[in-house]
Amino acid sequence: MINIIVELSKYLMIALMLVYTFECFAVFNYTDEYTQRSIFRKQNVLMFLLHMIAFLVMYLQTNETKMIGFYGMQVVLFLAVILLYTIIYPRVSRLVVNNMCMLMAIGFIMITRLSYSLAVKQFIIVSASVAISLVIPVIIRKVKALSEWKIFYAIAGVVMLGVVIIVGRVTGGAMLNVAIGGFTLQPSELVKIIFVFFVAASLKTDTSFKNIVITTAVAAMHVLILVVSKDLGAALIIFAVYLVMLYVASRQPLYVLVGLIAGSGASVVAYKLFNHVRVRVLVWKNPFTVYNEGGYQVAQSLMAIGTGSWFGMGLFQGAADQIPVAESDFIFSAIAEEMGLIFALGLILVCVSVYMMFLNIAMQLRDSFYKLVALGLGTCYIFQTFLTIGGVTKFIPSTGVTLPLVSYGGTSVLSTIIMFAIIQGLYVLREDEEEDIERKKLQRRRTSRSGSAAGEPARRERISRPKEEGRREKPQQTNGWRTKEKGRTQPPKKRTAASERNTGRKKRSQ
């Protein structure tokens, strides 16, 4: 009986995911608030149903009551996120909130299936991150000096990355983490956000060649430190983000071309200098030939995706726990194996809809600084998603980055939730800009109406005065004579031939 429920559940979850994904893009076709709110409510129902079915299956498979309690805690968290954001900020983007909750729900499902203890840690991290993120939209909306701190952003980014080289710990062959008071922090995740603010502040108004050279030098310093730390994923993300933001700010394709050429040259140099780069390229070419020398992860990932096929094996029916670091870097492979490739494709489309919403907000912002920030964060998010999925599917060499909001990882989850909160703040800021525009239009209309209403009596008076004066002066200007009986002007009589003869006779007789 349990096997039947598990088998049916995977098809039901795929159907729910497809409908949810369809609604993510359908909402862009509507502009009226009533229809959009209806779609958002439907998305919430679909998300909670998918989440409930998955935890029901895991409870039946494990027969552990802690699954039920953990499920209830997650439901409370999702309700709190949806309600708090919509109550505190009534004008936030509901699509961004819904997609954030959906991605976190999928992450909780798969991490719980792989390791219950890690899932509990992830839940604590997400809860704390959400609490922190609630104040960020207020900061974005109220603090107007964010665009003036470019020197601070540059120094903070370089210092945070430099600290990792000095006191950092090696994780997975790369120097990524710093231990602070019993907690592990990955500075590169936070530096990505700081770097976006630095580039936006630097290029918001000044796109001169001199300023671009200075900004490029600071960006290159970030990338170089990350390459030395062997954090290739973060280095590629910062490189891609800078190229996109530079092109949008300057509108010069030549800069992008030069950047791509320089990046290609740097890649060749890195391949010659660093052994870990050569190993990853070799694994990318054919992971099965170097299975015992570094290709084990990618090979297991490809086999897991192939085993799951279109509809998946079902939760706890596959061997997802055999994939190395399946809860973080290779979580997409675990999802594809047990929940199916169709479900995994739906997950990709949800990430794409998040990126589209980021771009939509960026295009509607009028301030160049905020526009560049939204564009940079969107590029950071979608490029990290591309690196993660491309690496586990052997589309590109593996870079060791996590899938945002889905993979396990403390600093990664914190930085992504902060990123979403910044976007929400920019969305509210965009609504404020639209309100200001409408208010100014209304004021201009009222001013023009009051001005025309005040000028109308004066205009009528100016028009009527000459007419009245003309009427009074007409009797004085007439060439006729006034009769005593009627007191009105008579025109002079016409002179006829008979009257001329009588006049002549009178003159001769005189």
Residues covered by each model-derived region:
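Long extracytoplasmic/lumenal interhelical loops at the membrane interface
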Residues: 305-342, 362-365, 369
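Transmembrane alpha-helices of multi-pass inner-membrane enzymes
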Residues: 18, 394-435
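Short, charged, intrinsically disordered terminal tails
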Residues: 431-449, 493-510
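Membrane-interface helix-loop junction between the first two transmembrane segments
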Residues: 22-40
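Hydrophobic alpha-helical transmembrane segments of multi-pass inner membrane proteins, especially
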Residues: 63-294, 333-391, 418, 422, ...
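Transmembrane alpha-helix interface/packing and boundary motifs in multi-pass membrane proteins
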Residues: 163, 223-230, 307-312, 387, ...
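Hydrophobic transmembrane alpha-helical segments in integral membrane proteins
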Residues: 1-17
